[in-house]
Amino acid sequence: MAKRGYKLQEFVAHSGNVNCLSIGKKTSRLLLTGGDDYKVNLWSIGKTTSPMSLCGHTSPVDSVAFNSEEVLVLAGASSGVIKLWDLEESKMVRAFTGHRSNCSAVEFHPFGEFLASGSSDTNLRVWDTRKKGCIQTYKGHTRGISTIEFSPDGRWVVSGGLDNVVKVWDLTAGKLLHEFKCHEGPIRSLDFHPLEFLLATGSADRTVKFWDLETFELIGTTRPEATGVRAIAFHPDGQTLFCGLDDGLKVYSWEPVICRDGVDMGWSTLGDFCINEGKFIGCSYYRNSVGIWVSDISELEPYGAVSEDKNECMVKRFSVLNDQSERMGSGPRGSVSPDYETREIKNIYVDCGNLNVAQNPGSLKATLPLESGKVATMVSEKQNAAYFGPAGDKYSSTSRDSDSGEESSYSERESIPFSRTKSGMLLRPAHVRKTLAKFEESKQSAVVQSATRKKSGLAVEEEPQTQNAFLSEQNASKPFDAEDSIIKGITNKFEKALSSEPPTDEANRMFLKPPRIHRSSNSKYNDTRRAMSADPATFGKGGMENSGDVEDIPSKTERVLSREKPGDEQKNTEYPSGSRELNPVKIVEGVNVVSGRTRSLVEKFERGEKTTHTEGASTTIEQNNNAVQEDPRKTSRQTGETPVISTRRARSTPARVMPIVLNRDSNVTSDEPPLTQPARTSSFPVMPVILNQASNVTYDEPSVALTQESRTSHARILPVTFNQATNITSEEASVTLRRQRRNSAARVRPVLLSQATSHECPVTSVRPLRTSPARVMPTKLNQSVNMTSDTSHIASMHRVSPTQMLATPTVIDQVADMTLDETHATQIQPACDNMPQKEEPNISDREDDSDITENLMLTHNEFLSTLQSRLTKLQIVRHFWERSDVKGAIGALRKLTDQSVQADVISILTEKIEILTLDMFSQLVPVLTSLLGSRTERPVNVSLDMLLKLVAVFGTVIRSTVSAPRIVGVDLHANERLEICQICSAGLHKIQRILPVLARRGGLITRKAQELNLVLQEP
């Protein structure tokens, strides 16, 4: 082996022994060393004086690491304490405690403020620098951990231990994914391939092994060397692996596994090395000294020059191959390398939904050999593009079209650095691995091209390099500095997004996003939620304050909630310009405040007082009660009849109005033919009166009178239907229908009454205030219906299926309590097998367009009242959010018992999971539990999504803390953490008992509930 490596410098680094060192991979110009003198020293390669010494440890430093920007420094000590320094501020910013023995390995997460540490206590811990605590603990090694490496996408972390085992951990699922046990010595170094789905492991057993991360199989191993492996790293182009041994440097190709070159370096203990600008830079240590070693990669195979004799031999031997390639290149389609797919940058760490990597091979051009510095620049640019991609997205890759040189990026934003993927979802696109024959063929082709250029008189002294033939000219001309600045800008964005500073304008406007509307089969009710969607373009820079539509809502709603007379309200509406608005919107501390209401609610929340969301509704109730003073008993004559009255308490869910079915042998007499509906503020459908066989009807007085008081909803009157063998002896057969003001439709549920009496029994249904819309349902008939009435202009046929005739406990629970006269017997009719199918009711007396418009406008005030209530609650939460009081916002959310508002806020928090702490998790558990009991689908889905992410982040911490033995002594922080974890654990156990019920609902809820149940069952 030729002497192609040399020592650049050597200097004394510490007053005691040097235990560890690390080179910054961004610039390859900074060096960290840790020693027995409890210090971490920063060095600039090429200089012998330390510009900075970091103090704070009280025991020897065993491990050090830079972050990707070389701004933060991490150091683990023999006591198990980990300290974090900021080089720009020259101070220690964090200290982490948790390991029971020396911290032997530390590593920064590639994105976000996370880090991992391994210790001799066999535990691997993942820490969050903002939460100042451990968020995940992995146990499985039987001896200490010696090295740690994150996957390029940050979703996996790999640990190598003194037990000769390499373990792959899935950060998203929080569990062991796979382990490799083929080494016979302690693991000393790990590295991921920059382009392929491949892992290399170096061990003290003097071998390097290559593992396929798609199948988790061993695909190759090197022959045992004379000495053990100290450090390994892939070349940025991915073709070769550089392996630092105890006594020298080896260069391996990984497919096939061949030793391409070797250099005797003469170092003592290699600590770390890097490859930058065509140079190999290694750092070794011995006692208290550090040595810097350099080797020129252009002089190493397969990147170095081949001898002249070997060139000529290759030209003669493969001249036929050259002629064939020239003939193929002159044809209509140029020759394409069979291994072009291995040269493309592939998105190898993406979700299942983002596998649209462009693979258009096109024609590939062979470029002239470039200087080693330019080669490294292009390769580094390629690698950075694969990891970061354009526009600042974390997880994206760029595939290059060889024909046009265009780039297409495929990226997906992540809520946390390692989320949104299940266990084992790291994927790799199909690629072509080169066999030995293909590798030799590509090498021979490169030699033939070089010889051809030499014969033509080209003044090129450097020998060709195989990888240059696959780099596009556009990529070669792109400066590295521009790419480096893009990467720096991307990283700065991530740091700002994950920092603990007060929320930015984007965070302040997080609640201005249009709520997600889930359309279920209950569309009549869900259609009213459409108006909540807001066009983001209508919001200005100031958020809600600059939106004219939002400002108009409180003013209109204030008129609804006011106690003014209807005449006054009409006067106010005569001024559409807003000059006569009663209570304009005011802006107080960035929050829209309606005078006299919103601000008082916010102040009450700050004082901790209890508030209610029914204040506005009570005003409307009082106004409606004043408008309706009619006694329902006035509709019946003083002739001794006993009215049947159905009453119901106020409720917030849609009501079901019960149609009355009068069966056989029922005699109803009346002198007054019109069937009228009394005047009222709002009403529900008049229940259809169905007179069955053998019924004698004479209009002596109203047969059915329905009076409904104090309502904010209204519905249309349903027809009166007469069945077979019905004798109608009436001089006036018309039915007068009086339509009153109404706001929403109601739902009809059938009640079948069998009456065998001739008493005059008017049936009166009295129902109190209803605050939510309902749905009209078709009525039910007992037998086939023949319309034989002169009132056919309002008649319709209603048919139902047999199953709709069954009375279930749910239906009975929703029906109002009825008190019937002793002469009236209530009976539930059995289902008939020969019932006709369900059919939509056809009402012939349709309203004209003006009536429809009027009816729609009558529901407008109720809709605005609902929106105003939700807006007020969201403003309360936003009031805390703008003060960076996330905990206070969650506390306010618990008091606001509005599931729609809770679902909206939690859906935003799901996208910002990094701001939540374990304490906030304990406060969110009751809210999430209540959302799981919602009858609508969206709150349940939002709750399950949040629980899946929270359990993935905090589940391991909660389980380990609750199951850990009690610590002897007084530790206030430990006791507080234990109490919080116990609260979270109890809440999760309660949720786990609810999941089997949710799993039976079907659809997306079932899948998420089953997934959460499996996660909670893990030990």
Swiss-Prot record:
Where in the body, by tissue, does this protein show up?
Answer: Expressed at low levels in siliques, flowers, leaves, stems and roots.
Q: From the UniProt record, list the coiled-coil ranges.
A: none
- Name the source's superkingdom: Eukaryota
**Which Gene3D superfamilies does the entry mention?**
YVTN repeat-like/Quinoprotein amine dehydrogenase
Organism of derivation: Arabidopsis thaliana
What is the protein's quaternary organization? Component of KTN80-KTN1 complexes composed of a hexamer of KTN1-KTN80 heterodimers that sense microtubule (MT) geometry to confer precise MT severing. Interacts directly with AAA1/KTN1 and KTN80.3, and weakly with KTN80.4.
* Gene Ontology process terms (BP): microtubule severing; regulation of unidimensional cell growth
Phenotype caused by lack of the gene:
The double mutant ktn80.1 ktn80.2 exhibits normal growth, but the quadruple mutant ktn80.1 ktn80.2 ktn80.3 ktn80.4 has a severe dwarf phenotype, with small and round dark-green rosette leaves as well as wide and short petioles, probably due to cell elongation defects, and associated with a complex cortical microtubule (MT) network with stable entanglements. Plants missing KTN80s have a disruption of KTN1 recruitment at MT crossover or branching nucleation sites, leading to an abolishment of MT severing.
Q: Which Pfam families match?
A: Katanin_con80 (PF13925), WD40 (PF00400)
Q: Does the keyword Hydrolase apply?
A: no
Q: Which residue ranges are recorded for the region named Disordered?
A: 388-424, 455-474, 517-581, 607-652
Q: Name the keywords, alphabetized.
A: Cytoplasm, Cytoskeleton, Microtubule, Repeat, WD repeat
Q: Which protein, by its recorded name, is this?
A: Katanin p80 WD40 repeat-containing subunit B1 homolog KTN80.1
Q: Where is the composition biased (Polar residues)?
A: 465-474, 614-628
| Family the UniProt entry places it in | Belongs to the WD repeat KATNB1 family.
Biased composition, class Basic and acidic residues, residue ranges: 553-572
Residue numbers covered by motif DWD box? 114-130
Gene Ontology cellular component annotations, sorted alphabetically: cytoplasm; katanin complex; microtubule; microtubule cytoskeleton
